[in-house]
C-alpha cells in the first residue's frame, strides 16, 4: 500500500523518466508489476510518484540506466566546455614536444622551403585529436610498435636530414642542450620511436577527417628530398625564411600527393636507415623553439578556416607564449603516450565524450569533403604538426568506443546485486500474492452479527434493499426493511449473492468505555477473596467464624444458595479489611462459581481434612486457574480425629496444586472453623498474598463494579448486590447494569445497615434498578439517568430479539426420527425464584436433563413471586410452575385451582431437580423385554374339524399358558412366532399346563406342525426406565 511520508517530495513522472533514462511506459509497467499501482497519481504531464518506497525501488531497478544517463550528460557538458580546455591541453603538449618538433621543422625547411606554411597546426584538425586520443589509446598502443617499424613518417625523415647540418645560431636552444650526450641520445631515440608510432595511425581515422592524403604527401616529399640532397645543401637551405614563401596552390599539392604515393614504397628503407643514423644528432638540435613562421602560419590558417577561428585564436596565444617558454625533456614511457599527448596528465572524466548520432558524423564528413582544398591543406599540415605525422582518432572510433562502454555499463551489474534484486522481487511478489489472497477472501466473507436487519444486510453485500426483499419473497419469505433476520435467512441471502457468512459477537454500539486511571491517583485497596470448595466442607462456617455471626442458621438445608458478599475489618490485623465472596458448593451453581472467580483477587480453597478432593473441589481449582487467580488452601475440620492433612496435600498435588510443603508456591493453612484454630494464620497468608499483588484503585472517580446478586423484595422492589471495583458509589448516582438502568435510591451493607457511599472492594445492596440484571453484568455509573436509560433500552431491544430467535426448534429430520421411534415428550416449565442467580442455576440444571425422547422446555423464568399471569401462561402452554424460595400470590393460587395448573415450590434447589427428573422418567416409554415361561415337545399331530391341526405335546420345562406367546423351532431354526389359540388336557380347556404333563394345543393361523418340533412360550415384560443424562 502506498504511503506518503512527510519528508518525501513528490516526483513528476517525466522528471523520473529523464533521470533514469527509461521510457514512461516502462516505468508504469514496472510499478504495476511490483504492486505500486497506487504510488502513481495523475495523468499526462501531471503524473507523479507520491510513494517514497516506489521511487527508491525504481532507482535501484534502473540504477544502470541512470548511471548511463548521468555519464551522457557529463559528456555533453564536457563537449560544450571542451574547446578552451582541449586547446590548453594541446598547447601544453606542443610545448613539451617542442624539441623533436623543432628538429623536424628544420629538416623540412631545408628540403622544401616552399611549404613552410604547412607546418602550422590549425585548430580545426586539432579538435578531435586531443579528445579522441584517450579513447583510441588501447588501439594505438597495440598497433604502434609494428607499424612504426614498417612505415617511418615523413617528419622523421626530415628530422634526420636536418639534424646534423642545421647551424646552431638559426634557432635558440634551452638548457637541455647542455645535458650529457648519452642522455640526449636516449631521449632522441625514444622521441623517434614515439614519432614512428604516432605516424602509423589507422588510415580510416585519417580518412574520417579528410586530412591523411595531405599529410602523407608532405611527409613523403620531405623524406625523399632529404635523402636526395647532401649535408651541405640541407645546411644552406635551412636558414631560408619561411615567412616570404607564398602559399602552395591546392592543385600543386594534389600533384605532389600523387607523386609522393609512388615514391613512398621505395623510400621506406632509406627512411629507416636515416632515422637510425641521425637520431642522436636530432636530439642535440631538437630543443629549437617555434619560429615566427609558425605564428604567421596560424594567422593564415585562421583566415582560411573561419569556422574554427576560436580554436585558432587560442592556439595563437599559446604560440606567442611559446617564444619565451622553454620545454623540458622527459622520457616517453611506451604505450601510455598517444601521439604527443600524455594520457597520465589527463583526468579520467576527460575521456568521456558526448555521444553523437552516426548521421551527424556522416553529414560532418561530407561537409569536410566539400571544403576548400586550401582549407584541407591547412588542416593536413596542422594535424601533421600536432600528431607528429600520424592521423588521430576519428568520430566513428569514438562512437564505437562509446557504444562498447555503454554496453559494458548496462551489463556491468554485479551478480550479488542481481541476486539481491531477484530476492527482493520474489519477496515483493509473495507479499502481493498474500495481499491478493487476503483481499479475495475478505471480499467474499460477510462478517455479520446475529439478527441483522434486511437493510443492514443489503448494505453489507452492496445490493439494493428491494432486490434482497424480492429474493426472500421468491423464496417464500415476506420481510420488511427493518425486520431482523435469523441466521438461516442471512446464510440463504449471502449464498444467493455468492458470499460466505461469518457470524461475530454482537457489537454493542452503546458500549460504555471506562477511562484508564493515572497511576498517581491509585491507592491501595482491600483484597476481594472468594471462598470456594465442595458441599459441606465448611466454607460458610469458616466465613461465619471470621464475621462472628451465624450465617448458616439462616440457610435452608444447611447449604449456601446465594452468593454472599461481606466486607470484614480485621481487628487483630491492624484494622485491615477483606471483602469475602461466599459461593455455593452445589453442582447447580457452576456459573456462580465461575463469576466469583472472575470478580475476585484471591481464592481460598476449602478442603475438608476428613474427606478428600471432591468433584466441586476440582471444579473450583479449574475456575481459579482459568481466571489466573492465586489460591490459598484452607484444610478445614482439623479438629476431627480422622483428619489427614497429608492426604489432602497429596491429592491437591495430583490436581497441579503444589503447596509450599511440597515445593510449590501455593500457601496452605490447617484450620478448624469450629474451634477457630489456624484462622489468624490463614488471614495472614491472605494479606501477604495481597501485598505481593499490590492491589490498587482510584476512589476519586465514578464507580464501576460487577453485579453479584439480584432479587425482588417486597417493599423494596429490585435489589441488586454490587461489588465496587473502582471509584466511589454514592446515593443518587445514575447507573447502567446490563440491560437495565436506574438511580441509586438507597444503599445497605451486608448487615442491612443503610450507608451513603461505598469505595473500592466494598459490596452494597443497591435499590433503584428498573429490573433484575443478570449476575455478572457490568455496573457503571453514567453522567445522567437519561443517558443510562437510552443505552439500556437499546440493549433490551437487541436482547429481546435475540431471545425470540433462540427459542429451541426441532429440525425436520429429528421430527421424522422421533415419529418413527415413538412419541416425543416435552415437559414445559415456568421457573420463578427469589434471586437471579438461583433462576439461572435452576434453569441450567434442568436443561441438562434433556435426552432424545424427553426434554425440559423453560418457556419463562423470572425473579419474584408467582403471579396470576404466570398461571395463565402455564395453562395455555400446558406447563408446570416451579417456585424456588418464592410463593404464589392469593390470586395466583385461586387461578391455579380454577385452571388446574400444578404449582410446586421448593426451598432446596436439588429437591426441585430430583422432582423434575422423576417427572421426566415418567414421560419415558417403558423398557420392553422378553421373559421365557416354558418349553414343550411335539410328539404327535392330528387334524380336528373346525379347529385345524392340533399338536400333542409334552411339557419339558416351565409352564405353557393360554395367554402366552409361542415360538416354533424346527431343527434349531425359528419357523413361526404367534399366540396359542387353544389349550386342552383330556378334552378340557385349561389355562396352564405344568412341566411333566401332556397337553394338546393349536397355534393361531398356523397348521404346519410336525413331530419333533420344539415350542417355546414367553411373555413381554415392560419396565420403567431411568433418566440417563
Curated annotation (Swiss-Prot):
Residues 400-411 have a biased composition (Low complexity). One of its GO terms (molecular function) is GTP binding. Disulfide bonds: none annotated. InterPro entries: EF-G-like_DII, EFTu-like_2, IF2_II, IF2_N, P-loop_NTPase, Small_GTP-bd, T_Tr_GTP-bd_dom, TF_IF2_bacterial-like. Residues 533-540 are annotated as: G1. The keyword GTP-binding applies. GTP binds at residues 533-540, 582-586, 636-639. One of the essential components for the initiation of protein synthesis. Protects formylmethionyl-tRNA from spontaneous hydrolysis and promotes its binding to the 30S ribosomal subunits. Also involved in the hydrolysis of GTP during the formation of the 70S ribosomal complex. Belongs to the TRAFAC class translation factor GTPase superfamily. Classic translation factor GTPase family. IF-2 subfamily. This is Translation initiation factor IF-2. It comes from Salinibacter ruber (strain DSM 13855 / M31).
Amino acid at each position: 500500500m502506498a504511503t506518503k511520508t512527510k519528508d518525501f517530495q513528490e516526483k513528476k513522472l517525466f522528471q523520473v523518466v529523464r533521470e533514469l533514462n527509461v521510457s514512461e511506459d516502462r516505468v508504469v509497467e514496472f510499478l504495476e508489476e511490483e504492486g505500486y499501482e497506487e504510488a502513481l497519481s495523475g495523468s499526462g504531464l501531471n503524473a507523479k510518484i507520491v510513494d517514497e518506497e516506489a521511487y527508491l525501488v525504481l532507482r535501484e531497478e534502473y540504477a544502470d540506466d541512470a548511471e548511463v544517463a548521468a555519464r551522457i550528460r557529463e559528456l555533453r557538458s564536457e563537449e560544450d566546455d571542451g574547446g578552451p580546455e582541449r586547446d590548453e591541453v594541446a598547447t601544453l603538449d606542443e610545448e613539451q614536444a617542442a624539441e623533436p618538433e623543432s628538429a623536424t621543422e628544420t629538416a623540412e625547411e631545408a628540403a622544401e622551403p616552399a611549404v613552410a606554411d604547412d607546418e602550422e597546426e590549425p585548430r580545426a584538425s586539432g579538435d578531435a585529436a586531443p579528445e579522441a586520443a584517450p579513447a583510441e589509446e588501447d588501439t594505438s598502443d597495440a598497433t604502434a610498435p609494428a607499424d612504426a617499424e614498417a612505415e617511418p613518417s615523413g617528419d622523421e625523415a626530415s628530422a634526420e636530414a636536418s639534424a646534423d647540418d642545421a647551424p646552431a645560431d638559426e634557432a635558440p636552444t634551452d638548457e637541455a642542450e647542455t645535458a650529457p650526450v648519452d642522455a640526449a641520445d636516449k631521449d632522441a631515440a625514444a622521441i623517434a620511436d614515439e614519432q614512428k608510432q604516432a605516424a602509423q595511425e589507422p588510415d580510416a581515422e585519417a580518412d574520417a577527417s579528410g586530412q591523411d592524403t595531405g599529410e602523407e604527401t608532405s611527409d613523403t616529399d620531405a623524406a625523399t628530398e632529404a635523402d636526395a640532397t647532401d649535408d651541405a645543401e640541407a645546411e644552406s637551405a635551412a636558414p631560408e625564411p619561411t615567412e616570404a614563401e607564398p602559399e602552395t596552390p591546392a592543385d600543386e599539392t594534389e600533384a605532389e600527393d600523387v607523386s609522393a604515393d609512388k615514391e613512398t614504397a621505395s623510400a621506406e628503407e632509406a627512411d629507416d636507415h636515416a632515422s637510425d643514423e641521425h637520431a642522436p644528432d636530432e636530439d642535440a638540435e631538437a630543443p629549437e623553439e617555434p619560429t615566427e613562421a609558425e605564428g604567421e602560419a596560424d594567422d593564415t590558417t585562421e583566415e582560411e578556416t573561419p569556422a574554427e577561428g576560436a580554436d585558432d585564436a587560442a592556439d595563437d596565444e599559446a604560440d606567442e607564449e611559446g617564444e619565451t617558454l622553454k620545454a623540458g625533456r622527459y622520457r616517453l614511457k611506451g604505450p601510455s603516450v598517444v601521439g604527443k599527448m600524455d594520457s597520465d596528465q589527463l583526468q579520467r572524466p576527460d575521456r568521456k565524450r558526448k555521444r553523437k548520432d552516426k548521421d551527424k558524423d556522416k553529414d560532418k564528413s561530407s561537409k569536410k569533403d566539400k571544403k576548400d582544398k586550401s582549407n584541407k591543406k591547412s588542416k593536413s599540415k596542422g594535424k601533421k604538426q600536432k600528431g607528429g605525422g600520424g592521423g588521430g582518432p576519428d568520430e566513428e572510433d569514438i562512437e564505437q568506443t562509446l557504444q562498447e562502454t555503454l554496453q559494458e555499463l548496462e551489463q556491468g551489474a554485479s551478480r550479488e546485486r542481481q541476486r539481491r534484486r531477484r530476492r527482493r522481487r520474489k519477496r515483493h511478489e509473495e507479499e502481493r500474492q498474500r495481499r491478493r489472497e487476503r483481499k479475495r477472501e475478505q471480499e467474499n466473507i460477510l462478517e455479520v452479527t446475529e439478527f441483522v436487519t434486511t437493510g443492514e444486510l443489503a448494505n453489507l453485500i452492496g445490493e439494493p434493499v428491494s432486490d434482497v426483499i424480492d429474493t426472500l419473497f421468491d423464496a417464500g419469505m415476506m420481510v420488511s426493511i427493518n425486520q431482523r433476520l435469523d441466521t438461516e435467512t442471512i446464510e440463504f441471502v449471502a449464498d444467493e449473492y455468492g458470499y460466505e457468512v461469518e457470524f461475530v459477537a454482537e457489537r454493542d454500539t452503546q458500549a460504555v468505555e471506562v477511562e484508564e486511571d493515572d497511576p498517581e491517583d491509585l491507592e491501595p485497596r482491600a483484597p476481594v477473596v472468594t471462598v470456594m470448595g465442595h458441599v459441606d466442607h465448611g466454607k460458610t462456617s469458616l466465613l461465619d467464624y471470621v464475621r462472628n455471626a451465624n450465617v448458616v442458621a439462616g440457610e435452608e438445608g444447611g447449604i449456601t444458595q446465594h452468593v454472599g458478599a461481606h466486607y470484614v475489618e480485621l481487628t487483630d490485623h491492624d484494622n485491615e479489611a477483606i471483602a469475602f465472596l461466599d459461593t455455593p458448593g452445589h453442582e447447580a451453581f457452576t456459573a456462580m462459581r465461575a463469576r466469583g472467580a472472575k470478580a475476585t483477587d484471591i481464592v481460598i480453597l476449602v478442603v475438608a481434612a476428613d474427606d478428600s478432593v471432591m468433584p466441586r473441589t476440582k471444579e473450583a481449582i479449574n475456575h481459579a486457574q482459568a481466571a489466573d487467580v492465586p489460591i490459598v488452601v484452607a484444610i478445614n475440620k482439623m479438629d476431627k480425629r480422622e483428619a489427614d492433612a497429608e492426604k489432602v496435600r497429596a491429592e491437591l498435588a495430583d490436581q497441579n496444586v503444589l503447596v509450599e510443603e511440597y515445593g510449590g508456591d501455593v500457601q496452605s493453612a490447617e484450620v478448624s472453623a469450629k474451634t477457630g484454630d489456624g484462622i489468624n494464620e490463614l488471614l495472614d497468608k491472605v494479606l501477604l498474598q495481597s501485598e505481593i499483588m499490590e492491589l490498587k484503585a482510584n476512589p476519586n472517580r465514578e464507580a464501576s463494579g460487577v453485579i453479584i446478586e439480584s432479587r425482588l423484595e417486597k417493599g423494596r422492589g429490585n435489589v441488586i448486590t454490587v461489588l465496587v471495583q473502582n471509584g466511589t458509589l454514592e446515593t443518587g448516582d445514575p447507573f447502567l447494569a446490563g440491560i437495565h438502568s436506574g438511580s441509586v435510591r438507597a444503599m445497605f451493607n451486608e448487615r442491612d445497615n443503610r450507608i451513603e457511599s461505598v469505595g473500592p472492594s466494598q459490596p452494597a445492596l443497591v435499590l433503584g434498578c428498573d429490573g433484575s440484571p443478570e449476575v455478572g453484568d457490568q455496573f457503571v455509573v453514567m453522567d445522567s439517568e437519561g443517558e443510562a436509560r437510552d443505552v439500556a433500552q437499546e440493549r433490551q431491544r437487541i436482547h429481546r430479539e435475540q431471545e425470540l430467535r433462540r427459542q429451541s426448534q426441532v429440525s425436520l429430520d429429528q421430527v421424522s426420527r422421533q415419529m418413527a421411534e415413538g412419541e416425543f415428550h416435552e415437559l414445559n416449565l415456568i421457573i420463578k425464584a427469589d434471586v437471579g442467580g438461583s433462576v439461572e442455576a435452576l434453569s441450567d440444571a434442568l436443561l441438562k436433563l434433556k435426552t432424545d425422547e424427553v426434554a425440559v422446555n423453560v418457556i419463562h423464568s423470572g425473579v419474584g413471586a408467582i403471579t396470576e399471569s404466570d398461571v395463565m401462561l402455564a395453562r395455555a402452554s400446558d406447563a408446570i410452575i416451579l417456585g424456588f424460595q418464592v410463593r404464589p400470590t392469593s390470586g395466583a393460587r385461586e387461578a391455579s385451582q380454577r385452571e388446574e395448573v400444578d404449582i410446586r415450590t421448593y426451598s432446596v434447589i436439588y429437591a426441585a431437580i430430583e422432582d423434575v427428573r422423576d417427572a421426566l422418567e415418567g414421560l419415558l416409554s417403558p423398557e420392553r423385554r422378553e421373559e421365557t415361561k416354558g418349553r414343550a415337545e411335539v410328539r404327535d399331530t392330528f387334524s380336528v374339524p373346525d379347529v385345524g391341526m392340533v399338536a400333542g405335546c409334552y411339557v419339558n420345562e416351565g409352564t405353557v399358558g393360554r395367554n402366552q406367546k409361542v415360538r416354533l423351532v424346527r431343527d434349531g431354526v425359528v419357523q413361526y412366532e404367534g399366540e396359542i389359540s387353544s389349550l386342552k388336557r383330556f378334552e378340557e380347556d385349561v389355562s396352564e399346563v405344568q412341566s411333566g404333563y401332556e397337553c394338546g394345543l393349536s397355534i393361531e393361523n398356523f397348521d404346519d406342525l410336525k413331530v419333533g418340533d420344539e415350542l417355546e412360550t414367553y411373555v413381554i415384560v415392560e419396565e420403567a426406565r431411568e433418566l440417563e443424562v
